Amino acid sequence: MATVRRYLNRVDLNMNFIRRIKRRYVLHRYPIQHAAWSAASDRLEILHRLSAVEKAHLRELSTLFLYGKQFIGIGIDLDDEMRVIIAAQACLPILHLGLELLSGWTDIIVYPDAFYVNHDQVDEYGVVHQQERLLSGEAWSRGPIVLSWSDIERDISDCHSGHNVIIHEIAHKLDMLDGSSNGIPPLHYRMPIPKWTSALHDAYSELQHDIQHYKRTCINPYAANSPAEFFAVLSEYFFTASEVLAVNFPLVYRQFQQYYRQTPLDH
């Protein structure tokens, strides 16, 4: 048993060494050009709160993200700055988590505007109906992320609105890491699941209650559609309108601080 353990440890060390070599190679061989990074980071006000060290780390993550993903424009030509804008916002939630959380899928599909998709919906009698929906973004389990460029531009222009389609879809990807989409991503060690579920369930119930009683809400009502959408929408608020989240759902904000390992309200 000890021999097997030593062998596995040696394999882990070798794999880590190979990953570090590949990382250095990609960063050296395929760097984001200064003009593209400067233009993108200047436009993305949500990045301005980051320290110089965090910005440098985000640039590295974005470089590796661009190398590992395939960008597919449908009805739109994607230039370097557009790709960097997408990559930087996609990597912001995992800035202190690690790029490996965004592995297992490759494609990022971008439409010029909101796009229609067909989904099967089962009614109370078990009859399947096909429903056409207009979306600004979509994330598939082990599949692509689909985005609307016009919505990305809108998010950039109104960056403190609590809306960011890229962060929303990345949150879905994080939520799906354990194979289900239920608003509970794989949590860190010493993050008790009951504490997470209690904070989010209470906030979710409160939002649903306010909507059912026609009360005005400070949170996008779309969050009340499901626990998965609640997590994704509130992740948007955490990064773009953190004060709104902290004031309305302080326990959720604290859980997100622990999960994302970031404190946007302090900047």
Across the structure, where does each feature detected by a protein language model lie?
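Zinc-dependent metalloendopeptidases
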Residues: 49, 74-77, 177
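Metalloprotease/metallohydrolase-associated module, dominated by Zn2+-dependent proteases
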Residues: 27, 42-45, 66, 72, ...
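Charged, compositionally biased N-terminal leader segments and the immediate start
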Residues: 2-35
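Amphipathic alpha-helical packing elements
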Residues: 29-71
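Active-site recognition of the HExxH zinc-binding catalytic motif
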Residues: 51, 161-177, 232
